[in-house]
UniProtKB/Swiss-Prot annotation:
Topology term for the membrane: Single-pass type I membrane protein
Extracellular-facing ranges: 28-104
Keyword terms of this UniProt record: Developmental protein, Endoplasmic reticulum, Membrane, Signal, Transmembrane, Transmembrane helix
Disulphide connectivity of cysteines: none
Gene Ontology BP, a term: negative regulation of Wnt signaling pathway
Compartments it resides in: Endoplasmic reticulum membrane
Protein name, UniProt field: Protein shisa-2 homolog
Keyword Transmembrane helix assigned: yes
Segments crossing the lipid bilayer: 105-125
Organism, scientific name: Bos taurus (Bovine)
Listed PANTHER family: PROTEIN SHISA-2 HOMOLOG, SHISA
Record bears the keyword Endoplasmic reticulum: yes
A Pfam family: Shisa_N
Family: Belongs to the shisa family.
Amino acid sequence: MWAGCHPDAASLLRLLLAALLAAGALASGEYCHGWLDAQGVWRIGFQCPERFDGGDATICCGSCALRYCCSSADARLDQGGCDNDRQQGAGEPGRADKDGPDGSAVPIYVPFLIVGSVFVAFIVLGSLVAACCCRCLRPKQEPQLSRAPGGPRLVETIPMIPSASTSRGSSSRQSSTAASSSSSANSGARAPPTRSQTNCCLPEGTMNNVYVNMPTNFSVLNCQQATQIVPHQGQYLHPPFVGYTVQPDSVPLTPVPPFLDGLQTGYRQLQAPFPHTNSEQKMYPAVTV
Protein backbone atom coordinates (compact mmCIF):
# COMPACT_ATOMS: atom_id res chain seq x y z
CA MET A 1 0.00 0.00 0.00
CA TRP A 2 2.86 2.37 0.88
CA ALA A 3 4.55 1.52 -2.43
CA GLY A 4 1.42 2.20 -4.50
CA CYS A 5 0.35 5.31 -2.70
CA HIS A 6 3.51 7.10 -1.72
CA PRO A 7 6.58 5.91 -3.73
CA ASP A 8 8.68 8.97 -2.75
CA ALA A 9 8.15 8.55 0.99
CA ALA A 10 9.76 5.06 1.02
CA SER A 11 12.87 6.20 -0.73
CA LEU A 12 13.14 9.18 1.59
CA LEU A 13 13.06 6.91 4.67
CA ARG A 14 15.84 4.76 3.31
CA LEU A 15 18.05 7.75 2.75
CA LEU A 16 17.43 8.96 6.30
CA LEU A 17 18.52 5.63 7.85
CA ALA A 18 21.71 5.53 5.77
CA ALA A 19 22.61 9.06 6.83
CA LEU A 20 22.15 8.19 10.52
CA LEU A 21 24.41 5.13 10.24
CA ALA A 22 27.08 7.13 8.43
CA ALA A 23 26.95 9.87 11.10
CA GLY A 24 27.31 7.28 13.88
CA ALA A 25 30.28 5.72 12.13
CA LEU A 26 31.96 9.05 11.68
CA ALA A 27 31.31 10.08 15.30
CA SER A 28 32.81 6.86 16.79
CA GLY A 29 36.19 6.84 14.88
CA GLU A 30 38.91 4.17 15.17
CA TYR A 31 40.38 2.67 18.34
CA CYS A 32 44.15 2.93 18.87
CA HIS A 33 45.39 -0.10 20.84
CA GLY A 34 47.91 0.18 23.69
CA TRP A 35 51.64 -0.19 22.96
CA LEU A 36 55.17 -0.02 24.38
CA ASP A 37 57.07 3.14 23.51
CA ALA A 38 60.81 3.43 22.85
CA GLN A 39 61.59 3.86 26.61
CA GLY A 40 59.75 0.62 27.44
CA VAL A 41 56.79 2.41 29.06
CA TRP A 42 53.35 0.95 28.41
CA ARG A 43 50.85 3.32 26.83
CA ILE A 44 47.14 2.76 27.33
CA GLY A 45 44.89 2.58 24.22
CA PHE A 46 42.30 5.28 23.45
CA GLN A 47 39.27 5.98 21.22
CA CYS A 48 39.50 8.50 18.39
CA PRO A 49 38.81 11.36 18.50
CA GLU A 50 40.35 12.18 21.85
CA ARG A 51 39.32 14.95 24.16
CA PHE A 52 41.49 17.65 22.64
CA ASP A 53 41.10 16.51 18.98
CA GLY A 54 38.71 17.86 16.41
CA GLY A 55 35.53 16.10 15.39
CA ASP A 56 36.99 14.90 12.11
CA ALA A 57 40.08 13.22 13.70
CA THR A 58 38.58 9.76 13.67
CA ILE A 59 41.51 7.80 12.17
CA CYS A 60 44.39 6.20 14.21
CA CYS A 61 47.56 7.51 12.65
CA GLY A 62 51.31 7.53 13.43
CA SER A 63 53.70 4.60 13.96
CA CYS A 64 53.85 1.51 16.17
CA ALA A 65 55.93 3.39 18.78
CA LEU A 66 53.80 6.59 18.66
CA ARG A 67 50.07 6.65 17.86
CA TYR A 68 47.57 9.52 17.64
CA CYS A 69 44.24 10.47 15.98
CA CYS A 70 44.02 12.32 12.68
CA SER A 71 41.60 13.00 9.82
CA SER A 72 43.92 12.07 6.91
CA ALA A 73 43.32 8.64 5.47
CA ASP A 74 46.83 8.55 3.98
CA ALA A 75 48.48 8.67 7.45
CA ARG A 76 46.33 5.83 8.77
CA LEU A 77 48.33 3.21 10.82
CA ASP A 78 47.95 -0.48 10.14
CA GLN A 79 47.82 -1.68 13.74
CA GLY A 80 47.77 -5.35 12.66
CA GLY A 81 51.41 -5.16 11.58
CA CYS A 82 52.71 -3.91 15.01
CA ASP A 83 54.12 -6.37 17.52
CA ASN A 84 54.42 -4.07 20.52
CA ASP A 85 50.74 -3.87 21.33
CA ARG A 86 50.78 -6.86 23.74
CA GLN A 87 52.30 -7.00 27.22
CA GLN A 88 54.80 -9.83 27.80
CA GLY A 89 53.41 -12.42 30.22
CA ALA A 90 49.98 -10.89 30.21
CA GLY A 91 48.43 -14.24 29.26
CA GLU A 92 49.70 -15.94 32.51
CA PRO A 93 47.58 -14.96 35.51
CA GLY A 94 49.41 -13.87 38.67
CA ARG A 95 52.69 -13.19 36.86
CA ALA A 96 54.10 -9.71 36.45
CA ASP A 97 56.70 -9.11 33.79
CA LYS A 98 59.81 -7.05 34.61
CA ASP A 99 59.34 -5.04 31.43
CA GLY A 100 55.64 -4.44 32.07
CA PRO A 101 54.11 -1.53 34.01
CA ASP A 102 53.45 -3.69 37.09
CA GLY A 103 56.94 -5.27 37.20
CA SER A 104 60.13 -3.71 38.66
CA ALA A 105 63.75 -4.90 38.48
CA VAL A 106 65.58 -5.61 41.79
CA PRO A 107 68.74 -3.43 42.18
CA ILE A 108 72.09 -5.22 42.36
CA TYR A 109 73.23 -3.40 45.53
CA VAL A 110 70.30 -4.65 47.65
CA PRO A 111 71.98 -7.97 48.74
CA PHE A 112 75.18 -6.14 49.69
CA LEU A 113 73.16 -3.60 51.64
CA ILE A 114 71.40 -6.35 53.58
CA VAL A 115 74.66 -8.15 54.44
CA GLY A 116 76.36 -4.91 55.51
CA SER A 117 73.46 -3.87 57.73
CA VAL A 118 73.47 -7.28 59.46
CA PHE A 119 77.22 -7.02 60.10
CA VAL A 120 76.92 -3.50 61.54
CA ALA A 121 74.03 -4.57 63.77
CA PHE A 122 76.09 -7.51 65.07
CA ILE A 123 78.99 -5.19 65.97
CA VAL A 124 76.69 -2.72 67.75
CA LEU A 125 74.99 -5.46 69.78
CA GLY A 126 78.36 -6.96 70.77
CA SER A 127 79.61 -3.57 71.97
CA LEU A 128 76.48 -3.03 74.08
CA VAL A 129 76.77 -6.48 75.67
CA ALA A 130 80.46 -5.93 76.49
CA ALA A 131 79.72 -2.53 78.07
CA CYS A 132 76.92 -4.02 80.20
CA CYS A 133 79.16 -6.88 81.39
CA CYS A 134 81.97 -4.49 82.35
CA ARG A 135 79.55 -2.26 84.26
CA CYS A 136 78.05 -5.23 86.12
CA LEU A 137 81.44 -6.68 87.12
CA ARG A 138 83.02 -3.38 88.18
CA PRO A 139 81.25 -3.03 91.61
CA LYS A 140 82.44 -6.54 92.58
CA GLN A 141 86.09 -5.71 91.87
CA GLU A 142 86.15 -2.40 93.78
CA PRO A 143 85.83 -3.96 97.29
CA GLN A 144 88.66 -6.37 96.50
CA LEU A 145 90.90 -3.50 95.44
CA SER A 146 89.99 -1.53 98.58
CA ARG A 147 90.80 -4.47 100.81
CA ALA A 148 94.24 -4.99 99.29
CA PRO A 149 95.90 -1.91 100.91
CA GLY A 150 94.64 -3.08 104.31
CA GLY A 151 96.97 -6.10 104.21
CA PRO A 152 100.26 -4.20 104.63
CA ARG A 153 98.67 -2.10 107.38
CA LEU A 154 97.81 -5.22 109.30
CA VAL A 155 101.30 -6.60 108.77
CA GLU A 156 102.79 -3.30 109.88
CA THR A 157 100.78 -3.23 113.08
CA ILE A 158 101.58 -6.84 113.98
CA PRO A 159 105.23 -6.14 114.97
CA MET A 160 103.96 -3.54 117.43
CA ILE A 161 102.16 -6.20 119.45
CA PRO A 162 105.33 -7.88 120.79
CA SER A 163 106.73 -4.48 121.72
CA ALA A 164 103.62 -3.72 123.75
CA SER A 165 103.80 -7.11 125.42
CA THR A 166 107.53 -6.61 126.01
CA SER A 167 106.91 -3.25 127.64
CA ARG A 168 104.20 -4.77 129.79
CA GLY A 169 106.47 -7.69 130.67
CA SER A 170 109.34 -5.37 131.50
CA SER A 171 107.10 -3.17 133.66
CA SER A 172 105.72 -6.20 135.49
CA ARG A 173 109.25 -7.55 135.80
CA GLN A 174 110.44 -4.23 137.22
CA SER A 175 107.61 -4.16 139.75
CA SER A 176 108.26 -7.78 140.75
CA THR A 177 112.00 -7.23 141.00
CA ALA A 178 111.46 -4.07 143.04
CA ALA A 179 109.24 -5.99 145.44
CA SER A 180 111.77 -8.81 145.62
CA SER A 181 114.59 -6.35 146.27
CA SER A 182 112.64 -4.77 149.11
CA SER A 183 111.79 -8.20 150.52
CA SER A 184 115.40 -9.33 150.22
CA ALA A 185 116.50 -6.12 151.93
CA ASN A 186 114.07 -6.74 154.77
CA SER A 187 115.22 -10.32 155.11
CA GLY A 188 118.81 -9.03 155.08
CA ALA A 189 117.99 -6.85 158.10
CA ARG A 190 116.95 -9.95 160.02
CA ALA A 191 119.75 -12.23 158.81
CA PRO A 192 122.89 -10.37 157.74
CA PRO A 193 124.81 -13.53 156.79
CA THR A 194 122.18 -14.41 154.17
CA ARG A 195 122.44 -10.97 152.64
CA SER A 196 126.20 -11.21 152.54
CA GLN A 197 125.84 -14.52 150.78
CA THR A 198 123.54 -12.90 148.27
CA ASN A 199 125.87 -9.97 147.78
CA CYS A 200 128.78 -12.25 147.03
CA CYS A 201 126.89 -13.57 144.04
CA LEU A 202 126.47 -10.13 142.45
CA PRO A 203 129.24 -8.33 140.60
CA GLU A 204 130.97 -5.38 142.18
CA GLY A 205 129.10 -2.10 141.91
CA THR A 206 125.71 -3.70 141.30
CA MET A 207 124.34 -3.07 144.78
CA ASN A 208 125.44 0.56 144.66
CA ASN A 209 123.02 1.28 141.78
CA VAL A 210 119.51 1.93 143.08
CA TYR A 211 117.96 1.57 139.61
CA VAL A 212 119.01 -2.07 139.11
CA ASN A 213 116.01 -4.43 139.02
CA MET A 214 117.04 -7.67 140.67
CA PRO A 215 115.17 -10.89 139.82
CA THR A 216 113.35 -12.72 142.62
CA ASN A 217 115.29 -15.96 142.28
CA PHE A 218 118.68 -14.53 143.38
CA SER A 219 118.03 -15.30 147.07
CA VAL A 220 117.65 -19.03 146.48
CA LEU A 221 120.41 -19.57 143.90
CA ASN A 222 124.03 -20.18 144.73
CA CYS A 223 126.82 -17.86 143.67
CA GLN A 224 127.73 -19.71 140.49
CA GLN A 225 124.18 -19.82 139.12
CA ALA A 226 123.44 -16.23 140.14
CA THR A 227 126.56 -14.96 138.43
CA GLN A 228 125.47 -16.58 135.18
CA ILE A 229 121.93 -15.17 135.37
CA VAL A 230 122.86 -11.61 136.34
CA PRO A 231 122.15 -9.49 133.21
CA HIS A 232 123.99 -6.48 132.01
CA GLN A 233 123.55 -3.44 134.17
CA GLY A 234 121.93 -1.37 131.41
CA GLN A 235 119.39 -4.03 130.42
CA TYR A 236 116.85 -3.22 133.14
CA LEU A 237 117.52 0.49 133.36
CA HIS A 238 115.19 3.18 132.09
CA PRO A 239 116.75 4.98 129.09
CA PRO A 240 117.05 8.42 130.77
CA PHE A 241 119.01 6.92 133.70
CA VAL A 242 121.50 4.72 131.81
CA GLY A 243 125.05 5.32 133.00
CA TYR A 244 124.07 7.21 136.15
CA THR A 245 124.86 5.85 139.64
CA VAL A 246 124.19 7.17 143.10
CA GLN A 247 126.97 9.29 144.53
CA PRO A 248 127.36 8.17 148.13
CA ASP A 249 129.51 11.10 149.27
CA SER A 250 127.76 13.91 147.38
CA VAL A 251 124.73 14.13 149.71
CA PRO A 252 125.39 14.79 153.42
CA LEU A 253 123.87 12.29 155.81
CA THR A 254 121.13 13.49 158.12
CA PRO A 255 121.12 12.50 161.76
CA VAL A 256 119.46 9.18 162.48
CA PRO A 257 116.10 9.51 164.29
CA PRO A 258 115.89 7.81 167.69
CA PHE A 259 113.34 5.27 166.45
CA LEU A 260 115.75 3.86 163.86
CA ASP A 261 118.55 1.47 164.59
CA GLY A 262 121.94 2.97 163.73
CA LEU A 263 123.61 -0.39 163.37
CA GLN A 264 121.82 -1.10 160.08
CA THR A 265 123.05 0.16 156.72
CA GLY A 266 120.59 3.03 156.46
CA TYR A 267 117.17 1.41 156.79
CA ARG A 268 115.43 -1.27 158.79
CA GLN A 269 112.07 -2.95 158.94
CA LEU A 270 109.30 -1.37 160.99
CA GLN A 271 108.11 -3.73 163.68
CA ALA A 272 104.41 -4.54 163.65
CA PRO A 273 102.57 -4.86 167.00
CA PHE A 274 101.48 -8.39 166.07
CA PRO A 275 103.95 -10.63 164.31
CA HIS A 276 102.74 -12.42 161.20
CA THR A 277 103.33 -15.95 160.14
CA ASN A 278 105.91 -17.02 157.58
CA SER A 279 103.24 -17.76 154.99
CA GLU A 280 102.14 -14.12 154.95
CA GLN A 281 105.03 -12.00 153.77
CA LYS A 282 104.02 -8.36 154.09
CA MET A 283 105.88 -5.60 152.30
CA TYR A 284 106.92 -2.43 154.13
CA PRO A 285 108.33 0.72 152.55
CA ALA A 286 112.02 1.32 153.09
CA VAL A 287 113.11 4.56 154.73
CA THR A 288 116.37 5.98 153.46
CA VAL A 289 118.68 8.26 155.47
